[in-house]
Amino acid sequence: MDVHQAYRLWAPTYHKETLPHYLDGELAHAMLQGLPQTHLLDAGCGAGTRIRDIPGAVGIDLSPEMLAAGGLHTVFAGDIREMPFASGQFDMIWCRLVLGHLRDPIPAYREFCRVCTPGGYVFVTDFHPDATLAGHRRTFNDEAGVVHEVEHYERINHADLALQAGLELVATRDGAVGPSARDFYIHGIGRRAYLRDFGLNLVRAYVFRRPEDAGS
């Protein structure tokens, strides 16, 4: 399903946490400790749930339905490939489980580099290629409980794409199905699926940095 239509249908139920979003949160907690986040941008923020309790954080998303569902005043409707922000405005940029929806993410990476302050960081997560190989898909349940598959492009070269845009790789880490994911399975698709998927990587995360002399 086209991402615009998908997020319009997903908006009413987006507040219900999914396993990829949960693992994304675990990765963020593990990888962002000690990094500056005084001026934070969540690019592709959805309903803005992640930044709701972060003072001064800003979000941008292409879906007006998602933004309306969140009801925040520090979010903007817009495309992460052409953002209405000043160059060097943010010391931390998140783009979490978003870039896989783009056929070509290079324009987004270039924008991240532009609006990131020199020495600042970009945190990116995506659906893991191992999950795709195992038959998992990017899906959601609408209000009627119908499951929809969202447009997704498998990609293993995020580090190369970010480098082309002027960012350098700092760290990468995988989020796998483990004990913390058990309840999602038990209350969802079942214990047998949990045992089948145990150890499977579902999310891959990257921390990039804009070099101090980038763009100078």
Go through each PLM region and give its residues.
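Class I SAM-dependent methyltransferase SAM/SAH-binding core
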Residues: 41-82
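A conserved beta-strand element that flanks and buttresses the S-adenosyl-L-methionine
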Residues: 94
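Conserved class I S-adenosyl-L-methionine
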Residues: 1-35, 49-53, 66-69, 123-151, 176, ...
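Short alpha-helix
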Residues: 150-166, 170-172
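C-terminal lobe and adjacent flexible extensions of AdoMet/dcAdoMet transferase-like proteins
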Residues: 190-195, 201-216
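A short glycine-rich, Lys/Arg-flanked "PGG" loop and its adjoining helix->strand segment in the class I
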Residues: 106-118
